[in-house]
Amino acid sequence: MNKLFVGSEIGQLRRVILHRPERALSHLTPTNCHNLLFDDVLSVEKALLEHDQFVKTLENQDVDVLLLQDLLEQTLENPEAKEWLLKHQISHYRFGPTFANQIRVFLLEHSNKELASILLGGLAFIELPFKAPSMLQQLSDPFDFVIAPLPNHLFTRDTSCWIYGGVSINPMAKAARKRESNHLRAIYRWHPLFSHHDFARYFEDENRYYDNATIEGGDVLVIGKGNVLVGISERTTPQGIENLAKQLFRTHQAKQVIAIKLPEDRSCMHLDTVMTHMDHNVFSVYPRVIDKNMGCWSITPCGEQHLDIKEMPNFQNVLMSALELDNLNIITTGGDSYEAEREQWHDANNVLTIKPGVVVAYERNTYTNEKYDKAGIHVLPITGDELGRGRGGARCMSCPIERDGI
């Protein structure tokens, strides 16, 4: 098996990318948090302690944890990578020609460790030691950001997702997250862990405007046996799914993409906030959103250039057929109607499967975790009182790059 390979949602998890977003979280305020796609300001100290616990939990299960900031710092050791990244992140069109050049010169004075921290965590105008002949600088408040922080990098699942033997470097839906993709492009292109391997790359062209073809990894479930399940959501569009499907089929990395329609609502912004795969025939679902009658389409290749797209009448039957199963064990969100809604909001259904029947989940979702336990699912609990306020659970916060198939 290629070391860079994700063959399922439930096979043995071997290696993941996580991000510990200290600088970015410290730049969140009540004034800017909504523009940065957070509902509230997190306690930085508590969030980092919770993230450290998450890392330790994975390492105790023999999962190799790579941190995004370390990968970016190591990538910046390559002069070509550094030049490319600064060219695209500090462009003339974003800052104006004179100001952009001076920002780049200033950033090049920093160590790779400091530069990685700034690119991920942000930089305010007041931190610049120079005054440029720039209207942008002159018109900006000193505490505005020259380089906006990227706190959503916490959710490494979204920006890139490995699908069998390839990786999708996703065109993000929201402006606050679009810069994230170039960090992953640089890492996958130049970091020694990836640059010496041959693997398929989707949406890799940084110069292409992908328009309405947006896709985020939280909507992508690699359910195994050559099938991919994708949610049509507020972040992932039909155009994005069809373009991904075409690339998967062209590179022979999948035989079928199953698309299901989600409500365009923040409480279920991605498929994995309402549905995750826990064991061979076991799924966690939020029943107010996921049911057998929801809109469902099967996408398969039609020759070399076209897609065969069929609307399907029963989602559960499509899922069982794809996985070659006779039945499904559906575990719904726990508690009464009020408790289930609260626990889904706090990512009760967003679990990270370590191996069949073993998952990492927030300990606060007691009603749902109890149902998992009764169904024979072993829960590795982590604290998520702060991290969960970012609207993401263990699956959201992890990007597997090596996982066994089924």
Curated annotation (Swiss-Prot):
It comes from the Bacteria. One of its GO terms (molecular function) is arginine deiminase activity. One of its GO terms (cellular component) is cytoplasm. Keywords: Arginine metabolism, Cytoplasm, Hydrolase. Belongs to the arginine deiminase family. Its EC number is 3.5.3.6. This is Arginine deiminase. It holds the Pfam family ADI. InterPro entries: Arg_deiminase. It is an enzyme of class 3 (hydrolase). Pathway: Amino-acid degradation; L-arginine degradation via ADI pathway; carbamoyl phosphate from L-arginine: step 1/2. It catalyses: L-arginine + H2O = L-citrulline + NH4(+).
